[in-house]
Every structure is written in C-alpha cells, then in structure tokens.
Amino acid sequence: MGEFYHELTLSPSSYLELFSDFLLEATGEGIEEEGNSIIVRSDQDLSWLIEALQEFCQTLSARVSEEVNFSHSLTWKRNEDWIERYRQSIQPIECAPFYVRPSWHPPKPDLIDLLIDPALAFGSGHHGTTNGCLACLGALELEGKRVLDVGCGSGILAIASAKKGAIVEMCDTDELAVGEALKNASLNQVIASKVWIGSVGDAEGEYDLIIANILAAILIMLSPWLKERLKPGARLILSGILGPYKEDVLRKFGGFTLEKELLCEEWVTLQLRKN
C-alpha cells in the first residue's frame, strides 16, 4: 500500500455479517469489524461501493421482509501501518473444545488448536456460521469417521474434524479457496485424504458426516446429493442459513431427524441425522 489509502467505514442497521461477506466478495480487500461498523481500506477509490451497497440493501430488504439500511463515511488517509492494526484487531476465539487463533497469538493449553491466518474472503472462525458448526463438531465423536467439508473456504471445519481423529475430504467451487484450505491444512499439520475443486456431486462413496456451511439457497440446490452421500444413521451439519429460510431447508430433509439447532447472530446451524 502506498503513502495514502482510501478508507470506507460502514455502519449497517442490521445483518452486519452479511454486509461483511458482501464487502469481502466485492472488493477482495481485508476488512476490519469494529463494534457495529465495518472498515475497508484500499489503494483504489472505494466510492463505487456506495451504489453497490445501496443495491445490496434493496435486495436484502426484500429477502428478509424488513428495511435494512446503512450509514457510511469515505476518507483518504495517510498510511500509518494499518496492516499491523488489522492484525491486532484479529483476536483468538474459544469455541470449546477448539481454540481458533492467528499465528501471532499463542495456543491455549487443554484446547484443540486451530491455527488460521485470516485471508481475504475465507473464514477465520469469527463468523457466526463457523462458530455454530464448530459447536456441533465439538460434541461429536469423530475418531475414524469419514467426513466431507462442502464449500470448505479456509478449511477450518475439515481441520477441526481431522484434529478430532476424522478422515477428512474437502471441496469448494472456488479454486482460490481450495488453495487456502490446503495451506491451512499444512499449517495445522493435517492431511486431507481427498481435496477437489467442485462440490458434493463430485464426491464418491458414503460419509459418516457431511458439513455444508454455505447459504440456504445452495443447500436446497445441493440437497439431493447431500442426502445421497450419507450413510444410514450418518449426520449432516448445515449452516449459512438465515432464520427466515430455516423451514425451507428443513423441508428438503424430511427423512432426517433434527438433533440440534443453534442460533449465532443472525445465522442458524442445524445438525441432522439420516433415518
């Protein structure tokens, strides 16, 4: 980054995590969450984002049937090592029995260490959907189980499963995500038995557990393959579901028993068992 940079501070009225996801995907820049605000910094002019955010608000408002808006400020600042400030803003997260941390923080005794350095658009454990999935994984016996992480992103959920003794596979339709997941697996000294660019439709055989932390619409679209690839009695962890869409997702899994439902921020995580 040069001597000066552009900084956008955004304060949504609600759905902070959705705005964060949108900004990550739209800009490819690292973001910082500070209270109820999101900060984006870039060498490039960010003024174009305002119109894009207004369109995003309209779409989101229609989907959730409530008014969503935001306030913002856009400034041009002298570079004062914001990267170091960003690093300091990323704090470890304890989601027992897991401890998610960046490399510049030490591990915590007696917890399963998940070493994830935040990347541009891949989960580092700070998202409500990731927390929900980790909470489910933490309570399951996974030793020797065959586990698939669909839409793996950073690979954090596959890595967590492997550290509990599972034989893991992971996939993502984004080639960059697969590369990031492999890097994080290596960082954690974890080996995935199979990794591919694609989705559950490309999987082979049956699994004891499938984790899919994506979005409700995609979970619905993938439901035939998710059901097909699970052994009888196997479990399915689904997340990325906003509350209003929970029933739509559950209807696609009528032959499953709902074992657990968690709400973290605006996000629902479901743990199901195949009958």
From Swiss-Prot:
SUPFAM superfamilies: S-adenosyl-L-methionine-dependent methyltransferases (SSF53335). GO terms for molecular function: protein-lysine N-methyltransferase activity. It catalyses: L-lysyl-[protein] + 3 S-adenosyl-L-methionine = N(6),N(6),N(6)-trimethyl-L-lysyl-[protein] + 3 S-adenosyl-L-homocysteine + 3 H(+). Its main location: cytoplasm. S-adenosyl-L-methionine binds at residues 130, 151, 172, 213. Its EC number is 2.1.1.-. GO terms for cellular component: cytoplasm. It comes from the Bacteria. It is found in: Cytoplasm. It is an enzyme of class 2 (transferase). Pfam families: PrmA. Keywords: Cytoplasm, Methyltransferase, S-adenosyl-L-methionine, Transferase. GO terms for biological process: methylation. InterPro entries: Ribosomal_L11_MeTrfase_PrmA (IPR050078), Ribosomal_PrmA_MeTrfase (IPR004498), SAM-dependent_MTases_sf (IPR029063). Methylates ribosomal protein L11. Belongs to the methyltransferase superfamily. PrmA family. This is Ribosomal protein L11 methyltransferase. It comes from Wolinella succinogenes (strain ATCC 29543 / DSM 1740 / CCUG 13145 / JCM 31913 / LMG 7466 / NCTC 11488 / FDC 602W) (Vibrio succinogenes). The gene is prmA.
